[in-house]
């Protein structure tokens, strides 16, 4: 008997993947190929995406899975991508201008001068989204100022997930989780903001019908089915921005903060209410729409493992195993014997170490970095609790930084709450598949789909004794 699966097409900045997931959230088959942006013809410093190349990469992945998928029934397809990017298209869905990449610097000047139209504070209060130069709003203003005729000619703007969905189904739609990253919404109304659109001279007609996560978009058309090597007629279900599905796929409940720990740490929560008027007071803050109606995802981000990479390169070598650094830091007591580190190496003039003596070792420096980053997390968690109106009783940790057991224990001790570590790296795919199963009618809600998954967490409890982490 063939196995039912949801096929998740995930377009990341560095990889394009096709992953088949069963009803219990287990991965049945997967394929991946490298993804990369292209240099724009107009300017060698500019970056853009080739939609045709991305679709061909999906096709390569799906075709490499043909043997595994021949044993499966693909019940539905969902598409997840990074946020903000998209393109203007004509009535046939043909791109009028290439997809400007989030890596492209051309929109930075628009962000710096957005006050010509609307104050940055009002913009964040309405949209929730922080001032990041890659925001969709700045792309559209750039296009309006540099290619005004294209906006007049355009049938609509499609976010990158919707560009892919259009190629699959022929339908023009807007994934709500993608719109939530755009800086164009009134986040409390869950719709495009008349005030932002009017201030910037953008027409509401540019944005096609909004679809909620888990809603059917259409079915796989013949040409797309032939390209992917799949049967035509498979339902395509709305997903969208990877972050929202990673939160849901990690098992996060409402009011449970999630820390994605990597080069940057991104702290978010699924909250029933949010005070967006507070956001502009905190650099690096943002708020996106949750995958489920009625919830918000306020969050903050800061450089984290990027600081630790710098410390390793400075005091060891870039190739030194992390365990060497961890072992040296573990030998130093909590508080690093008075050595402290201000870890904001990007913006703070006082960044660096204090309290250094002739007895200070590099283990002190690394331990102080771990404790300094944890202090930064503690401040940001308190801020997020205020913005999102919740009280954290535990912290769910995902990402590469969660493999550092010493750092996990320091977090538990300094925050004085349990740290819950999920080792499964495929949270985005898991979350999107749950909405896919709901969308094809297999479950009555995404939560019921999630309840089929057996999550395995490791806990780090607050300790007053020195770190006891052997065997973890």
UniProtKB/Swiss-Prot annotation:
**Which of the seven top EC classes does this enzyme belong to?**
transferase
Q: What does this protein do?
A: Catalyzes the phosphorylation of L-fuculose.
Q: Which gene encodes it?
A: fucK
State the needed cofactors, names only. a divalent metal cation
Give the organism, scientific name.
Salmonella typhimurium (strain LT2 / SGSC1412 / ATCC 700720)
Record's protein name: L-fuculokinase
Similarity remark: Belongs to the FGGY kinase family.
Its EC number(s) = 2.7.1.51
* GO CC term, one of those recorded: cytosol
Q: Copy the pathway line from the protein's UniProt record.
A: Carbohydrate degradation; L-fucose degradation; L-lactaldehyde and glycerone phosphate from L-fucose: step 2/3
**What GO biological process terms are annotated to this protein in UniProt?**
L-fucose catabolic process; rhamnose catabolic process
InterPro entries the UniProt entry points to: ATPase_NBD, Carb_kinase_FGGY, Carb_kinase_FGGY_CS, FGGY_C, FGGY_Carb_Kinase, FGGY_N, Fuculokinase
Give the disulfide map. none
The entry's keywords = ATP-binding, Carbohydrate metabolism, Fucose metabolism, Kinase, Nucleotide-binding, Transferase
Q: Which transformation does this protein catalyse, written as a reaction?
A: L-fuculose + ATP = L-fuculose 1-phosphate + ADP + H(+)
| GO MF terms held by the record | ATP binding; glycerol kinase activity; L-fuculokinase activity
């Amino acid at each position: 008997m063939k196995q039912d699966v949801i096929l998740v097409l995930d377009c990341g900045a560095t990889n394009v993947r096709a992953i088949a997931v069963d009803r219990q959230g287990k991965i049945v088959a997967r394929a991946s190929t490298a993804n990369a942006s292209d240099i724009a013809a107009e300017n060698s410093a500019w970056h853009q995406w080739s939609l045709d190349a991305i679709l061909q990469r999906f096709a390569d992945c799906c075709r490499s899975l043909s043997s595994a998928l021949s044993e499966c029934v693909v019940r539905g397809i969902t598409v997840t991508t990074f946020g903000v990017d998209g393109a203007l298209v004509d009535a046939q869905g043909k791109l009028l201008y290439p997809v400007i990449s989030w890596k492209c610097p051309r929109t930075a000047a628009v962000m710096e001068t957005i006050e010509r139209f609307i104050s940055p504070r009002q913009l964040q209060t309405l949209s929730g989204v922080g001032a990041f130069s890659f925001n969709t709003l700045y792309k559209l203003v750039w296009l309006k100022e540099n290619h005004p005729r294209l906006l007049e000619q355009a049938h609509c703007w499609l976010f990158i997930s919707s560009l892919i969905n259009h190629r699959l189904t022929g339908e023009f739609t807007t994934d709500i989780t993608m719109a939530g990253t755009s800086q164009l919404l009134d986040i409390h109304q869950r719709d495009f903001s008349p005030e932002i659109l009017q201030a910037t001279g953008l027409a509401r007609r540019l944005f096609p019908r909004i679809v909620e996560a888990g809603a059917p978009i259409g079915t796989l058309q013949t040409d797309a089915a032939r390209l992917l090597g799949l049967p035509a007629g498979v339902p395509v279900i709305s997903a969208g921005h990877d972050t929202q599905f990673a939160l849901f796929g990690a098992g996060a409940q409402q009011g449970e903060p999630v820390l994605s720990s990597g080069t940057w740490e991104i702290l978010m929560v699924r909250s029933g209410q949010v005070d967006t008027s507070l956001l502009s007071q905190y650099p690096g803050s943002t708020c996106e729409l949750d995958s489920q109606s009625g919830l918000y995802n306020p969050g903050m981000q800061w450089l984290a493992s990027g600081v630790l990479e710098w410390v390793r390169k400075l005091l060891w070598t870039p190739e030194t195993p992390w365990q060497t650094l961890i072992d040296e830091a573990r030998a130093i007591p909590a508080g690093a014997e008075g050595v402290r580190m201000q870890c904001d190496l990007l913006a703070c003039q006082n960044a660096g170490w204090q309290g250094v003596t002739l007895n200070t070792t590099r283990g002190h420096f690394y331990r102080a970095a771990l404790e300094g980053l944890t202090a930064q997390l503690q401040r940001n968690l308190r801020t997020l609790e205020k913005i999102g109106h919740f009280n954290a009783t535990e912290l769910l940790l995902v990402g590469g930084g969660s493999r550092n057991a010493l750092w996990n224990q320091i977090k538990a001790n300094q925050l004085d709450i349990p740290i819950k570590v999920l080792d499964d790296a495929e949270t985005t795919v898991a979350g999107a598949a749950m909405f896919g199963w709901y969308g094809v009618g297999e479950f009555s809600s995404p939560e019921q789909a999630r309840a089929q998954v057996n999550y395995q967490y490791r806990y780090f409890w607050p300790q007053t004794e020195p770190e006891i982490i052997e065997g973890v």
